[in-house]
Amino acid sequence: MNTKKTLALALTAALGCSLAGLAQADKLDDIIESGKLRCAVTLDFPPMGSRDAQNNPVGFDVDYCNDLAKALDVKAEIVETPFPDRIPALVSGRADVIVASTSDTLERARTIGMSIPYFAFVKVVLTREDTGIASYADLKGRPVGGTAGTFEALALEKDSKAWGDAKGSFRAYQSEADTALAISRGISTPRSSLPPSPPRGSSRASTRA
């Protein structure tokens, strides 16, 4: 399944979206006056966001933030933000825009504005090769988990409860690093992935998450 990712916005007018109003105009004015655009970016999710050998933020989402700031003639400021904190960072004013692989959902749209999609991912389930999991259905009755606050984790948690198997369980992890550690211990997790292949040492099962 492909899931389209969007920018989560507090400055819809800046991106040419149809939403308009005093609040958006004021926000854009504040950004231009400050001379910087603060982008909430997740930096443990390569190639979308990570750090290079010099500890500088790099990745597609980082580039997108830089391009957006350039279009506004301001300086880009990367605000490192874990997946669970993306929307809180925007709502609280710690960031002006989320550029962090955020799926557009109705629930999120009730709280924040969304841009048009800018990227599409393939949904996969990451497992250890020795788990014997070959399909999404094989996850029933297994310990599963995902990174808290992500669309994939929310969908898998919902399915895990719907399966009603007492042997199964779901756990949310606070970072991609914690999720990767769980995979190494035999927990299966959903993730947005760039085709064609998952990370070395993992097997890929189909998923509708």
Language model segments and positions:
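Extracytoplasmic small-molecule ligand-binding "clamshell" domains
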Residues: D26-S101
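Ligand-binding cleft/hinge of the Venus flytrap
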Residues: A53, C65-V74, E152-A172, S202-S206
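Beta->alpha turn/N-cap motifs
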Residues: V41-F45, V79-P84, G93-T105, F121, ...
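A ligand-binding cleft/hinge motif common to bilobed small-molecule-binding domains
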Residues: D85, T102-R110, L154-A162, A182-A209
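Flexible hinge/capping segments at coil-to-helix
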Residues: T127-V144
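Short Pro/Gly-enriched coil loops immediately N-terminal to beta-strands
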Residues: I112-V124, D138-L139, S206
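Short helices/loops that flank or line small-molecule/ion binding pockets
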Residues: K70, V79-E80, P84-I98, T111-G113, ...
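A structural signal for short loop-to-beta-strand junctions that line the ligand-binding cleft
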Residues: L28, F60-D61, R108-Y118
